[in-house]
């Protein structure tokens, strides 16, 4: 069977995350980033504004190496691309570069579960230079770890587990008094099991006084849609939540077979959407990569 390849593309939506969560992407003005070269993609966008500049961090992935790095794309106030560079590279695959500000510093918490660890980085010279601060130990090797400071403590939401079903459909939580830890796994972990809405997919936000978390709907395909998980109660001992309907990818683009990031960034919101390549070239690329590795 030909190898199917998910190819993602990032969009900048001129709407706030609360608006999109309420009504979806239909009718929204979306500025799509340029397509990547063949069998490469940018995904998992997160960003910060500084002095009328949008600093957008994303996973840059090439199917020829099957290794993700973190790229930075810088835009001006009119969302014109000014620069692009790789700012974080490790021996292991990196993705989901959750970037945020806290305690007078700028932090990044990229997904790196293939390293069996979660590493917290701090900007030494934003946005280009980052240093390792600590490695966070949790009950599973975390996937798409998503932090937020809420109700006087830090919370961390993540997926993970020994099999694909857990990685797609199990949501865990942990809490800490300080960002650097120690972190305490929630006693009800996994706090949610649902392939249709458990794996984190963007920035948490408040709707009124209710904490909301974008999660991925993976029932039909990986990252098929985004849903909003509302926490009606969240303490170190208890959790009560409800989930909203799927938010679908835009239909007026070839990238309409998936949507798995919804990230607030000031007056704009960052998303990604995918198309699936079914040509069989992915199988040939895999074969060539394995041959190169065997010959090395």
PLM segments and residue spans:
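Carbohydrate-active catalytic/glycan-binding domains of CAZyme proteins
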Residues: 1-296
